[in-house]
Amino acid sequence: MVDNKLSQYVQKQLDNRDKTGLVNYLLYENGKIVINKKNYNDVIKKNKNVLRSNSIGKSMISYVIGHAVCEGYIDSVNVKLDDWIVLNDTLYADNTLLQVLNMTSGDEDYIGETKFNDDGLFNGERNKQVNRRTVAESMLWFKGTKKKKENSRYNYNAMSTGVAINYAIHKVGKDYEKLLKKIFADHVGIKDTFHFMKVSWSPKDVVKGSQRYSFFATSEDYLRIAKTIMNDYHSDSCIGDYLRFIYDNRIKKKLKDYPRRTNYQSAAATYEYGGQIHFSYKGMKDRVIFAMDGFAGQQMIIDMDNKRILIVNSIDQHYNWNKIVYKVIKN
């Protein structure tokens, strides 16, 4: 472990947790952990140090889908989603899996940050939150909808993610829990508990699309996941091909269209997006950096070029993102 100016500043941010919200900071580079500091509150300790990812879970969803493709459950990410009855007569049935993964579903008139100041409200209505309903229930609002155009613009929203993972679960079927174990327990080597959130834990609701994207794991297991993704990216393997494919097929966000909605103190303030992952930081557009971002300051950043990983967890985002995240990755 290092004890430098960065480490000391991070400690001050952690000590001032009630103001900064920072609870965990882990920096991995040159094949070892160089900073590993935490200041958990009683709620986190009570939950066995498991940390909620929020929208970092969207990126975990993509990783699961990549494995589902590699295991042969899904032909490719270019398949149309019109073979899942839940999506019938909605714009999502007219999309490919890659299009929903890239947030280019053509749904901006109905949901998402392009038109509405939220990622999960249908038509911007507070009583129509897609994150609280199964995909089947949410699709009742989308009946008769058509996507904007074939090559639609980036529109960040929770519905595309929900459609993507629950379509994958539909294709994997009864093997889904076995697939999760194969990915996270066997391949990644997770040591502690982990799980995705669901809107319903009833087995009968699985066919309706009940899984959400929020993911829970310990800091140490987030590092294991990030290291595995980094190693996969550099490997001659199917999942490596998938990770390189989503990077090669990333799309431009056009952030100027989001001036009031983008959190510029987060990984969301990047210029490109692909496969539920943010790419292309300002000043780092020529570097391959997988930037994963979650509400309230959650960050998992994998610098593929320099083999550096940064994991940040917080209960609210008032920490100095520019100093302990952006500048660390840029240097």
Label each PLM-derived region with a short phrase.
Residues 12-45, 300-302, 307-311:
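A short, well-structured edge-of-sheet supersecondary motif
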Residues 15, 44-60, 68-153:
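Active-site-proximal loop and beta-strand segments within enzyme catalytic domains
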Residues 35, 47-48, 113-201, 210-213:
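Catalytic-site signature segments of enzymes, centered on catalytic residues
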Residues 71-110, 159, 172-213, 217, ...:
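Active-site helix/loop module of the DD-peptidase/beta-lactamase fold
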Residues 121-124, 199-216, 263-267, 273-278:
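Carbohydrate-binding/catalytic loop surfaces
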Residues 191-197, 249-309:
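Active-site Gly/Thr loop motif
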